[in-house]
Amino acid sequence: GTVRVFLDSPDNLLFQGKAEDFFRKPVEILSGDSSLGKHTESFYQYDASYFPIPFSKGFRMEWTGKISDIHFYHVGLRLYDNDQEVESFTRENFRKYKATMIRTDSLLRNPDHRPASGHYSSMNGEVRLEPGEQAVLMDLKGPSSITRFSLRADAGNLENALRQAVLRIWFDDSETAQVNAPLGDFFGAAPGINPYISLPFTVLTDGTMICRFEMPFSKNARIIIENHSAEKIKVSAEAIVARFRWKDGESMHFHALWSMDHDLTTSELDSRASDIPCLAAEGKGRIAGAAALIHNPSGVPTSWGNWWGEGDEKIFIDRDTFPSFFGTGSEDYFNYSWSSSRIFSYPYCGQPRNDGPGNRGYVSDFRWHISDDIPFRESACFLMELKHHGKVEGFSYGRIIYYYLLPGGNTVTGLFTAHDLREINYEPWMPEAFKGSDGWRFVQAEELARGNDRVSFEKDDFWAGSGVLNWIPASGQDVLKLNIPSDKEIRETRIGITLTHTPDSGSLTFRLNGEPVRFSGRDTLLVFTAAGRLLDNHFSGPVRLKKGSNELMIGMPGADGRKTAQIDFIWLRK
């Protein structure tokens, strides 16, 4: 469709044109300067644009098109008190504020490159904890503010340790900890170390985790680590502490509230969704972000079938009887769409972990409310619906809400139990034919491999059938041969292959019965990912299968004995 956008009066038409142009690239469209768009790319974050358009009197948007074709758009508005002066946007702003826009873009891309200002100091702490122990990591005196908090943990099983060691921070002798979350979950990318860069949080490949949310306090701050795991844990941390002028009645404490529900049974598309409580706070404050930490043990290997996020966010502010924020699906809240299985991160949103294939396994999503923080004067209630494409038992829904609250406010909090902090488990699974995978049958790659001294079989419940075929070719001349069976000749069909994407994965080529085959539309399939591991599905173009044995020959151009190919299973049409 098309949209028309008016600022302040019906005579002031700011834009008229394609809706997609306005929502996806307003800088290029409104400025007419494509080069400026390249210097402000961080304003566009997956399916969301964060380019601000201020107005002093009024805003009007009209959409024209076929109702049957429209999906939906989200438009976020921030309204100020009447005595607040606002300069309405004009195209002249691009010339006037060009340098500021470019600097802002640079800061969003590289949040640790901003110059330090004012009086600050670096405080360091280190603790070594036996199972069941707790220790004070830092004791800080105020009035001050933690402007950057970085932490690194070492343990034998780090994934479990980061879930079962708890970070608690008390500000100004509070009866309850304002920050109360598992060590890894606090940084928004659990379980384990899942590298990403955003404005308030970063996780580095070496395991360093960084928080840049400002944490002011008037008198003191105490940071404690509790070890509920069976691991010995070493935790090292640094806090950058700046002078802060605390103002009673204005200054707020930072809060991070974590909660977890295990062993849920998800509702299907045609059944009623259940609401997952994320936050219930009383007092004056601002919501600054949210993260979802999911375990989705569905056996369906496609997003259309294993997608967990059809539920909507509902955020009630103050005396709302109907939510001020009522979403259109969990992925839309997290700024992506169509149940994306990509690993990605932006300044305000990201998905640093998604095991796959599709959206199964462990998943972490986050959204930070920085330029769109959500203020409340009396109360805030944040609910997220859980609605799945299918019925799944053993589902886990963890979440953490980040917010600021004026001292004297209250938050409904629950104490952690050993069950909440249980170990990270990978349960055996097999691919199921349902919705997007309906009409397919699946064969484990281990059953199809022919003799090859560069092949091994790795056991782990991360993969279907509790194992994966691991091939490490010595050179680009090596090939891996898989035997694809067919009980009849099929003149035209497709085959699929589910591969593990890792930092050590090589690029792959394919030939079926001697003929080149393209997978995912590519002659050479790229299966590299910068960090971690994920399973992804790739499908061939049209191929012909003969009755009996069909040879799928896989090559790895440029192989050097270090790059790997990990093949989980093959898809064949029923």
Question: Where are the language model's segments positioned?
Answer:
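Extracytoplasmic
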Residues: 307, 312-316, 423-574
